[in-house]
Regions:
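A short beta-strand-turn-helix
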Residues: 1-13, 55
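Non-catalytic, surface beta->alpha helical segment in thiol-disulfide oxidoreductase systems
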Residues: 70-93
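Typically the conserved alpha-helix immediately C-terminal to a functionally engaged Cys/Sec
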Residues: 27-40
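Hydrophobic beta-strand anchors of alpha/beta hydrolase catalytic cores
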Residues: 15-16, 46, 69
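Structural microenvironment flanking redox-active thiols in thiol-disulfide oxidoreductases
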Residues: 51-58
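Structural micro-motif
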Residues: 61-70
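Short pre-active-site segment immediately N-terminal to redox-active cysteine/selenocysteine motifs
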Residues: 11-12, 19-22, 65
């Protein structure tokens, strides 16, 4: 968990994608996240966290459903949303 907090407190804004391998909407969101990664390049870090492999951090952050995306800048949560989010909305982060 220490590494997670180290990453989100870094200079590069971070979008955290909480997902699960069995989750249908997560599979729908995955190519959208890849498109965002391509468009934003080095200006945005994307961190993917499988909630089944990392249940402690998911519980600590109150992740109740997947996919859930959380946007951090300088360690502060600025945006949070669950479900499949359109690329247009993610580009505004």
């Amino acid at each position: 968990m220490g590494k997670f907090y180290e990453i989100i407190k870094g200079e590069t804004p971070t979008l955290v994608d909480f997902h699960a391998t069995w989750c249908g909407p997560c599979k729908t969101l995955a190519p959208i996240i890849e498109q965002l990664k391509t468009k934003k390049g080095q200006s945005l870090r994307i961190l993917k966290i499988d909630v089944d492999k990392n249940p402690a951090i998911a519980a600590q952050l109150g992740i109740r459903g997947v996919p859930t995306l959380i946007y951090y800048k300088n360690g502060k949560q600025l945006w949070r949303k669950s479900g499949v989010i359109p690329l247009r909305e993610l580009e505004t982060l």
